[in-house]
């Protein structure tokens, strides 16, 4: 496993991507631009959408990021992804698709639950995501205590997690955070969704001290600002988050806030910089699903190769520009125009 440079951990899901009318969203009390965990009342939704045209795409935020990151790296099998799957056909689909992108998969397998699924409901290029975690919910820290995973953790020089993983195995997240801090390895983290900050704030605040680079979109950043009593001004939130409690003081914390088509804000070493994303014609956008995940993938690819932050943001913007012109988190068959 000496080639593995980047370790991503998260909730492996198979996305069921479909276009729906607003009536479906209203029926299940869902909002566009939102992501939630499925409750009992949402479970009939998965069967209902299968009666229409559904595309099956590998998903899960960190898995999306790992695939895009590996796509933008010349050397394959340098990104490793882990999470928990079942023993069903969906697990095979996920493994095959993810490894076809050059990613090394080291799934924990749980035969007691089906592989997780996410209904991606698209309406006018906006989406609502409803996740039934299934086996992903059963990830255990014991996986990181196997000899194989210990070797991978030791080999990895960069770590990437997203907030969704905190609903499943917060002790695993802290375990990786501690390893990164103790060994002065960069630990990157995406806030992922406002509900995670609202309902799992104790877990988020426990992990943040280990985070060297934190990613969020404007709504996630504003939610964190409210929870921290920092207000809703993104500039203020970025500055305060950068200065917040940190375990590895050898590294300053960098804060990256994306804002869709508006400028990405980066707070680093006391300075706020704005970077404009690549403009995309509305008619060229197929699906905004995974725009944030792909930004993190591009950023991580550049960052893992020692690029300056400006170049990392450029790579993130490029990756998003490519992915939003695909359906779901589909990695293009062509080579990227920016590669490291």
From Swiss-Prot:
Subunit structure: Monomer.
UniProt protein name: Adenosine kinase
Family assignment from sequence similarity: Belongs to the carbohydrate kinase PfkB family.
GO MF: adenosine kinase activity; ATP binding; metal ion binding
Pathway: Purine metabolism; AMP biosynthesis via salvage pathway; AMP from adenosine: step 1/1
The protein's Enzyme Commission number: 2.7.1.20
InterPro entries attached to this UniProt entry: Adenokinase (IPR001805), PfkB_dom (IPR011611), Ribokinase-like (IPR029056)
Annotated GO biological process: AMP salvage; purine nucleobase metabolic process; purine ribonucleoside salvage
Organism: Dictyostelium discoideum
């Amino acid at each position: 496993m000496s080639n593995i440079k980047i370790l991503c951990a998260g909730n492996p899901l198979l996305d069921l991507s479909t276009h729906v009318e607003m009536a479906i969203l209203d029926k299940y009390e869902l909002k566009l631009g939102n992501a939630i965990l499925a409750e009992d009342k949402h479970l009939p939704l998965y069967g209902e959408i299968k009666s229409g045209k559904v595309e099956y795409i590998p998903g899960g935020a960190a898995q999306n990021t790992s695939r895009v990151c590996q796509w933008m790296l010349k050397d394959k099998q340098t990104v490793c992804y882990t999470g928990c799957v079942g023993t069903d056909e969906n697990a095979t689909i996920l493994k095959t698709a993810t490894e076809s992108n050059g990613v090394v998969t080291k799934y924990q397998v749980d035969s007691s639950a089906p592989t997780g699924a996410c209904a991606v409901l698209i309406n006018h290029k906006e989406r609502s995501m409803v996740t039934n975690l299934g086996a992903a919910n059963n990830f255990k820290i014991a996986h990181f205590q196997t000899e194989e995973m210990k070797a991978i953790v030791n080999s990895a020089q960069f770590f990437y997690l997203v907030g969704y993983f905190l609903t499943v195995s917060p002790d695993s997240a802290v375990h990786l955070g501690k390893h990164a801090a103790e060994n002065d390895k960069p630990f990157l983290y995406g806030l992922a969704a406002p509900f995670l900050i609202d309902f799992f704030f104790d877990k988020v605040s426990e992990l943040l001290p280990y985070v060297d680079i934190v990613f969020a979109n404007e709504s996630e950043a504003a939610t964190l600002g409210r929870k921290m009593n920092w207000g809703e001004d993104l500039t203020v939130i970025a500055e305060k988050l950068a200065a917040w409690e940190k375990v590895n003081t050898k590294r300053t914390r960098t804060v990256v806030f994306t804002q869709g088509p508006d400028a990405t804000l980066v707070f680093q070493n006391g300075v706020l910089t704005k970077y404009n994303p690549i403009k995309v014609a509305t008619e060229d956008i197929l699906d905004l699903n995974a725009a944030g995940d792909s930004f993190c993938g591009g950023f991580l690819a550049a960052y893992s190769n020692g690029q300056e932050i400006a170049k990392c943001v450029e790579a993130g913007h490029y990756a998003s520009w490519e992915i939003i012109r695909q359906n779901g988190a589909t990695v293009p068959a062509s080579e990227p125009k920016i590669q490291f």
